[in-house]
Amino acid sequence: MNFHIGNEVWWEDPDNNGLRSGAYEVVDIDRDNDVLTLSNGSSIVEAFSDECVFPSEYLYNS
């Protein structure tokens, strides 16, 4: 996947029938360690791998 600072990652709320509950911006991209940091402080690892799988609660929105 191709990420840029400012891309949005939506949060899906499993307690609300999976509806989108908000979005977090990508605030840091660490390509050397293959990690994205979101504005809520969470990290997504292996973000640039072909096998990248977002945690089930997140949906990528380019």
Task: Enumerate the predicted regions with their spans.
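Short coil-to-beta transition motif at edge beta-strands of beta-rich domains
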Residues: 1-15
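Basic/aromatic-rich interaction segments and small domains that mediate binding to polyanionic partners
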Residues: 12-48
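Intrinsically disordered, low-complexity, charged/polar segments
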Residues: 40-62
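A generic structural signal for solvent-exposed, polar alpha-helical segments
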Residues: 9, 16-17, 30, 54, ...
